[in-house]
């Protein structure tokens, strides 16, 4: 466990001792539940804190070491009291909840303005970090043995047993003490991805993993239990269900520059347990909830005991244990039952959690008693007229005040995903040097794996700082700046959620995008196959938007084994930006200069040599390549180890399940190695089932797709549904294809049937017109503007779940009906080697359908021109309520 020296060092930490004194002051005062009085106490204490800071600034050179240290101690205690009052005591008051509501009185609104100003003052304080550093560096026991008059020795020696108030952080020493002495009444909650938890976590009797992407700040404790833990082992679910039976709950996560999202989610979960535990109220039973100071890495550095959890990939089928699946439960990333429209991309285009501009509420505490000063009246009156406030006592200027130690985060601009600059392709054009040796090729489908990277981060809107006099100090006005733009990740400072958060990636004042931009693309030598696919793919507004607002950058995974380290994604984004610049906000018949996508084509050629020269290629193959390549660049799980093959027992168990359930499990298994916005937008799944005609034994495999290839019957004319009938029909295997039945132990007459088990948000249908000999079937396949594929979706759920699984698996949008509207058509005339590709694309209500032939484009001549016998690839988008 914790080493003796490290324990002693933590035990005599002056910050812990002084925090205990501040806690004691707050606990001893229970005189008022009035929010106005509590705010007055905070302002009085703030004045005292600022006076101490002023003393240090004015007189520090003339003070003796003991006098100086005493002032630093007083300053820290005053600050800590304000911290507890503002972030814990006041949010627990009944008046605070009513003041936050939409029907709050004017007086309550003014109180909230003052409260927010106090919070902002805490967040912007730049002196407290220096105070902490000084107290630790100049501790009397360290520099002047015997001079301990400043220190309360009894408090010091008992620090490990004096736990702070609920909602506060505790040290590694204190957690170690709880584990040793109260292990049976202690619950640990690890807020890290399941893979990291399984690899190593704190050793304790009761420890569970709640993945940071599985909950959001609007959840209650019951929603965490029912939704966030749906894929957790039954043992962990049972532990969380018994959360009201413990005396202590400690939440911890990984604390580092790269895990700020985890740290933010730790605060969100703390808020849920302390203020939204409606199913099992923890406050009523006096259960203390803490966070672990310095997190899991701090525990490991102090040699805290850890253990590893090993999981078998087929545990879901054998025991109902879904923990190895690492479900990516992003809020609303896939639409839920009852979605009236497809809104689920909002979080991917924005941030991880949907912040609602609420003030972070923490646990109930009591107030300290301080002598009143007349400053509150001035502040309150000032707030009425100017929404700002003043305090009579002086304070250090904001430039001198620092965030508290809980928020030693890097600058925001350092939080974006850093990926290598792509090669200067233009230089290579000029020098005719094509190879980009540093780019790793994407040679196959994205079936690789990882330790899940942080999926989404939550930006905090920069605040417009308007200063008004507060004595000689300053207060800050919490108004979003109209020009502010969301940075990459949150910087959690104090245990408090950021104010004025945005729920969408587009800023409040960001101009609306014209996602139906229209521009031609130059043919660079048989590149029509590329041009038509680009035009068709960009009919998907969600895809265009994440590249136009650059949110894709935050999802680039440098560790993805099959990715190009962002090269393909970056050059695709540049192309989309260029097309948008030339083709957006144009009048219906206004023409513009065509775009030459030469750099994008060279990037594609550097990744896959098939697209390097000027030979004609199959547009469907390019579409598959582009989607796979973008997926691998943005694959959040691209470095995970591959899933183990199912055991024979697990396969038998899977065959007993309905395809609806088995396919859902396989989809979750797939997401542990492949998770990206491309998956969410375009990927579906089908089942391939072999069946022995002698004994009836079956074997089913599940395959994902982003482009669904359906056969075209050799008839004079057919409908697209005929192609789906052909795709899903029972096929009798020939003599040379007989299946070796595991039950009969020999090859037997057998059949094969494909069943669509997951229909994606955007369905790309490839009409297989070419056979193995490259002969083309030119039959006119009729396809509608509105396509209903509900009858082809596996809907065979019989109520059975794997043993041990009591809750349904996530639907992830797989709720009928499945209706699609036609968005685009890639057409082909001629042979595979000597033909030409063009595109029909729906450019929205204002522009209507357009025909694209490389550089030229025009509105279609009549309503049905886009229903062409030359159709080769169809692009459909799912619609609701039609």
Curated annotation (Swiss-Prot):
UniProt xrefs under InterPro entries: Papain-like_cys_pep_sf, Peptidase_C19_UCH, Rhodanese-like_dom, Rhodanese-like_dom_sf, Ub_carboxyl-term_hydrolase, USP_CS, USP_dom
Chain intervals for the UniProt region annotation (Disordered): 382-411
One GO term describing the cellular component: late endosome membrane
Domain Rhodanese positions: 182-308
Ranges where the USP domain occurs: 519-879
Cross-referenced PANTHER family: UBIQUITIN CARBOXYL-TERMINAL HYDROLASE, UBIQUITIN CARBOXYL-TERMINAL HYDROLASE 4-RELATED
GO molecular function, one term: cysteine-type deubiquitinase activity
Enzyme class: hydrolase
Keywords: Cytoplasm, Endosome, Hydrolase, Membrane, Protease, Thiol protease, Ubl conjugation pathway
Low complexity bias spans: 382-399
Topology within the bilayer: Peripheral membrane protein
E.C. code: 3.4.19.12
Family as reported in the entry's similarity comment: Belongs to the peptidase C19 family.
Main localisation: cytoplasm
Species this chain originates from: Vanderwaltozyma polyspora (strain ATCC 22028 / DSM 70294 / BCRC 21397 / CBS 2163 / NBRC 10782 / NRRL Y-8283 / UCD 57-17)
Name used for this protein in its record: Ubiquitin carboxyl-terminal hydrolase 4
Compositionally biased region (Polar residues): 402-411
Compartment list: Cytoplasm; Late endosome membrane
Active site (record annotation): 528 (nucleophile), 836 (proton acceptor)
